[in-house]
Amino acid sequence: KLAPSLKPKKRYILFKILPETKGKTFWKREVIEALEQQIIKCFGIFMHAKASPMIVKETFEEKSGQIIIKVGHKYTDELKVALALLKQIKDHNVTIEAISTSGILKKLKERMHHQTGKA
């Protein structure tokens, strides 16, 4: 078993997808496909493997447009830039902004639900 100090450190980043068209929502599959393609496009295959970004699938909320992505702690800034450069999802203009970063998923989920008004 690996000692905790030797385990790869990770960060969870809460992103918000802001569509240009007010009230527009996206299907979970559309968002995940667009984000994964953008990450590979910006990171390249080698850096993608090192950063190991993963979309925490159960965290996507269609109404609020929020999603949490897990990434290696050294690559948080690169991930934020890669997703900020994403301008379209399914032919709709979008802006993606990073809301918060945490090393603990539970804390980020609480922040996410606090922002959307859920308990």
Q: What is each residue range found by the language model?
A:
Residues 1-2:
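Glycine-rich, charged/polar anion/phosphate-binding loops
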Residues 70-77:
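Helix N-cap motif at beta-to-alpha junctions
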